[in-house]
Regions:
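Long mid-to-C-terminal assembly/interaction modules of large eukaryotic proteins
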Residues: 297-453
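Flexible loop/turn segments at secondary-structure boundaries
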Residues: 27-31, 67-71, 102-106, 146-149, ...
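Substrate-binding/access-modulating region of protease and related hydrolase catalytic domains
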Residues: 1-90, 103, 173-176, 180-182
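A Trp-anchored, charged/polar loop motif used as the substrate-binding/catalytic surface
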Residues: 1-11, 115-126, 275-288
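An often Trp-containing, charged/polar helix-loop segment at the C-terminal end
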Residues: 196-221
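Short, small-residue alpha-helix embedded
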Residues: 181-195
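Secreted peptidase-domain scaffold signal
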Residues: 228-329
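Catalytic-core environment of secreted peptidases
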Residues: 98-113, 117-182
Length: 453
C-alpha cells in the first residue's frame, strides 16, 4: 500500500519533483531503532538503487504521537519513554518530531503543559533505542500543546494549528502533534525544492537539518554540557527547529556552502574488497577576516547527507554494519596538521575495519565528535572555537566506512557509486564582518579531485 501510494502519482507524471510526506505510523515498540520491513521499504524507495534510471525521493515522516493523556500529565518524563514509531527509524527519511510555541489558551483555570519553545507533550523520541542506531527525530516543527488544571490534562483548539477541514460542512479545523509538524516540514522542503530545483533530495534534507537550532527552552530541558549530553539532546529534540530563511540565504555574518559530489567507496583487489576513494573539500575560508578576528568565537556547522541501499537480506537489519550498503564519514584537518598528515590519518581511518576510532583525536571543539556523530546516513556536528584556530584548518574529507557493498562481494556491488551532499556554514555572531563577500569568488573551487586510497 505504501509503495503504491508512491508510484501512482509518478505513473501519471513521472518527472515532476515531489516531496512525499506520511503521518501514518505503527505503535508496536519492538524495533528499538532497528530497521523494520516498513522502514527498509522507505529506505529502498528513497534511494531507488534498483531502477534502470534511479530517481531518488525525499520522504518526510512523522515521528509518531503520545496519545495517552496520563502521559501528557507526566510531561516531560514521558518523552523519554515513548519511542518513535515505525517507520520513523528509516535511515534515508527526514523524521519530524514536534515542539510548541503555543502557550496562550482561552480556557479558564487551565495552564499550558509545555513552556514556549519546549518539546510538545505529544512528541516521541529515540531515547529508548540502542545507541548505535540513528539519531531521531532529525528536526522538530510546531505540533501544538496540551493544558492541565488540578484534575486532568486535555488538548484544546486554541493550542492547535489551524488547517482546512475534510468535511464539506465546515471550511476550517485544527490539527496537532507530529502529523502537523511533518506537514510543516514537507512545506519547507517543497519551498527549498522550488527555489533550488537542481538540488538532490539528499541536499534538501541536509539544508533543512542544517538550518535547525535548539530553542532556549530545549536547552533548559536537556542541558548539553558534554558529548553525551548533546547526544541526549538530539535524541529528544533532533537538531532543533529549522528556519526556512536561514536555509535559503546566507547573511552577512554567516556563510553557507553547498557541495553535491560522489565517490566510489570500494574496489576489488587481490586481497579482497578494500576502500577506494576519499574526497578532499578545500573550504574557501575568508582567511584574512578569520585571522583578524583572533580569539573571537565562531561556529562551524557541517552536515553530510546521503542515501544508503538497505541490505536485501532480512538478517542485515540486525547490525548497523550489515544494514547499509555503505557508510560515509567526514573529518576536518586539525590546526597543527599538514595536508599530507591529514590524508595519511584519513587513509588509515578508512582502512580501519569499523572506522570508528581513526579520526577521533582531539574532538574538544566538536559538540558530538567522530565517535558519536556517525549514525544513520545524516551526519551533523558543530565546531566552536577561536576564529584564528579555524583559519588554520581549511580542508574537510569525506571517506567511506563499512557496508554490505564491501562485505557481500558475491552480489557484485563493490564498484557502485555513492552520491552525497555536504553543507558547511561559518557563523560569527559576535563579529561585524562580511564573510559572504570575502569568499564569493572562491565558491566554484570548493572541491579537490578525488584521492585514491
Amino acid at each position: 500500500l505504501f509503495s503504491s501510494a508512491v508510484t501512482r502519482p509518478e505513473i501519471l507524471n513521472g518527472q515532476r519533483k515531489r516531496i512525499f510526506s506520511s503521518a501514518v505510523t505503527a505503535t508496536a515498540y519492538r524495533d528499538f531503532g532497528r530497521p523494520s520491513a516498513w522502514s527498509s521499504m522507505v529506505d529502498s524507495l528513497a534511494v531507488d538503487a534498483l531502477a534502470e534510471t534511479p530517481f531518488p525521493r525525499l520522504f518526510v515522516l512523522s515521528a509518531g504521537n503520545i496519545v495517552d493523556r496520563d502521559h501528557w500529565g507526566n510531561y516531560p518524563a514521558s518523552l523519554s519513554v515513548n519511542q518513535i514509531h515505525d517507520p520513523g527509524q528509516s535511515w534515508n527519511a527526514l523524521t519530524v518530531g514536534a515542539f510548541t510555541d503555543k502557550v496562550e489558551l482561552n480556557e479558564p483555570e487551565f495552564i499550558p503543559v509545555a513552556d514556549q519553545g519546549a518539546l510538545s507533550p505529544f512528541t516521541t523520541t529515540s531515547m529508548g533505542w540502542e545507541p548505535v542506531w540513528p539519531f531521531k527525530p532529525d528536526v522538530v516543527f510546531e505540533g501544538g500543546n496540551a493544558a492541565a488544571n488540578t484534575e486532568f490534562v486535555d488538548n484544546f483548539a486554541s493550542l492547535e494549528l489551524l488547517t482546512t477541514s475534510a468535511s464539506s460542512h465546515r471550511q476550517f479545523w485544527t490539527t496537532n502533534a507530529t502529523s502537523a509538524a511533518s506537514a510543516l516540514c514537507a512545506r519547507m522542503a517543497a519551498r527549498l525544492m522550488a527555489q533550488y530545483p537542481e538540488y538532490r533530495p539528499e541536499t534538501i534534507r541536509a539544508l533543512i537539518t542544517h538550518s535547525a537550532q535548539w530553542t532556549p527552552a530545549m536547552l533548559r530541558m536537556y542541558p548539553a554540557r558534554n558529548k553525551s549530553g548533546f547526544a541526549q539532546l538530539i535524541r529528544h529534540c533532533g537538531w532543533g527547529s529549522p528556519d526556512v530563511e536561514r536555509a535559503l540565504w546566507s547573511v552577512k555574518n554567516s556563510l553557507t556552502l553547498v557541495a553535491e559530489d560522489s565517490l566510489y567507496p570500494y574496489r576489488k583487489t587481490r586481497d579482497g574488497i578494500k576502500t577506494r576513494d576519499l574526497n578532499l573539500h578545500a573550504l574557501p575560508w575568508p582567511l584574512e577576516q578569520l585571522q583578524e578576528l583572533q580569539d573571537t568565537q565562531v561556529e562551524l556547522r557541517v552536515t553530510l547527507s546521503y542515501f544508503i541501499e538497505p541490505n536485501p537480506s532480512a538478517r542485515g537489519s540486525s547490525s548497523r554494519y550489515h544494514y547499509p550498503s555503505h557508510r560515509l564519514r567526514f573529518a576536518m584537518k586539525r590546526q597543527t596538521e599538514s595536508l599530507d598528515e591529514f590524508k595519511t590519518r584519513i587513509n588509515a581511518a578508512a582502512e580501519s575495519e569499523e572506522s570508528e576510532h581513526g579520526t577521533t583525536g582531539n574532538d574538544d571543539n566538536w559538540s558530538l565528535g567522530a565517535t558519536q556523530r556517525h549514525k544513520g546516513s545524516l551526519h551533523q556536528d558543530i565546531w566552536r572555537g577561536a576564529a584564528a584556530e579555524l583559519a588554520s584548518c581549511g580542508y574537510l574529507a569525506v571517506y567511506p566506512a563499512q557496508g554490505w557493498w564491501r562485505t557481500r562481494g558475491a552480489l557484485q556491488r563493490f564498484d557502485s557509486e555513492a552520491k552525497y551532499s555536504l553543507v558547511v556554514s561559518i557563523h560569527a555572531p559576535e563579529a561585524d564582518v562580511d564573510l559572504y563577500a570575502a569568499v564569493e569568488t572562491l565558491v566554484e573551487n570548493m572541491v579537490e579531485n578525488p584521492v585514491e586510497i
